[in-house]
Amino acid sequence: MFFHATLARSFISALSVRGDDDAVDRLNYYYTPLILAVCCLVISAKQYGGTPIECWVNPHSRESMEEYIESYCWIQNTYWIPMYENVPDDHTAREEKQIGYYQWVPFILIAEALMFSLPCIFWRLCSFQSGLNIQTLINAACDAQALLDYSDRQKAVEAITCNFVDNLDLQSPNGRIRARGWIARIKFSRFLSGQCISIVYSFTKLLYSVNVVAQFFILNACLKSSEFVFFGFQVLSDIWAGRPWTETGHFPRVTLCDFEVRYLANLNRYTVQCALLINIINEKVFAFLWCWYMILAIITTCSFIYWIANSFIHSEKVDYVMKFIQIAESSEYKKLQKFEKDATVERLYTVIAFAPHLLDSFVSDFLKSDGILMLRMISNHAGDMIVVQLVRNLWQEYRERNWREFEEHEEMKDVEMRRIQGTRERIVIANPGQTKSFL
């Protein structure tokens, strides 16, 4: 018992909320299993602590016989025949109308909760095996965001930057070293270099979407319904319109049960009428779950498409990084304006050198898809201000590593600025009277 309790606590702690995911992931692996656990608890309380079924027997029968019949009918399944139809004499026809799901509802809900947790377990195992410390980075970023002192925050961001760069370098190993195992070859292949964890996370998103859709098949298979997803809408429509179960047959409350009694070497068959009280709760629970699964399927699918676009479309990645670079550049320019009164509109003193081809190389060759993924994770949990400082430091790191290209760009920029300045001087000389208006 102690081992099972420890195992359960370990499983729950392993699925606790962490920083290496988003809100949609938490709806799937954390909040949905909680909802299913509550539903399972409510149904189990009625099923094992209350009276899930009551059967009408001969008033002259003993109480022990009544308890036996109710236990037998609960275990052996019951069947539903509309009140306006005759009960068929053929026992095979009765078996075809059997209702055999009500005993297994708690176990079905537990299985569904485990299925919602599987993609999360897959993601965390792969994230751990990849070597990227995404969770550590996000926790450090959240701690840095909480710091009020500017110098302490800067030191924390610099430490995060060093760790971030180490993670990026880990995803781009030296190509001259040949990997021996086939797993290492796949992980360090040129195609997957820098985007391995992004592919894994996108695949995890796909697993969440597939799992939600699979729940409709599972529920209908358990309820033996051929109406697929519209069965849930039909149940909701019946509840809303006030149509009784006696007309629809959805989650019937009154069913029939056949049992046999051996008496004096003879086998006597009896039919009793039973009230399935548990189906009152089952109807409300499954109707709610259908609504929740439909909403969750839409949200999860949209989230999957969103992450696919932002992780693998180059223009989206460039625009995302450019936003933070422009914010950092604007912030530095405003700081310079406080001390440099002659700072011109052309931003001659700009700290972050900007060039389109260098930005493309920064995104595709330095950050890559995995770096963009980590930046988005940090932004989701620690806020954009930390990401602005982090991107600024990463840009400076990239600038130091590619100083030759930046020097060439600065030289071209100086030549262009001298040409513009010379043009202005010629304009002033040609129109000396206009200079008075600027004095």
From Swiss-Prot:
Signal peptide: none annotated. GO terms for molecular function: gap junction channel activity; gap junction hemi-channel activity. It is a multi-pass membrane protein. PROSITE patterns: PANNEXIN. The chain crosses the membrane at residues 33-53, 103-123, 199-219, 285-305. Structural component of the gap junctions that specifically coordinates left-right asymmetry in the developing nervous system. Acts by forming gap junction network linking embryonic neurons and providing electrical coupling between cells, leading to promote or inhibit AWC signaling. This is Innexin-19. It comes from Caenorhabditis briggsae. The lineage of its organism: Eukaryota, Metazoa, Ecdysozoa, Nematoda, Chromadorea. The gene is inx-19.
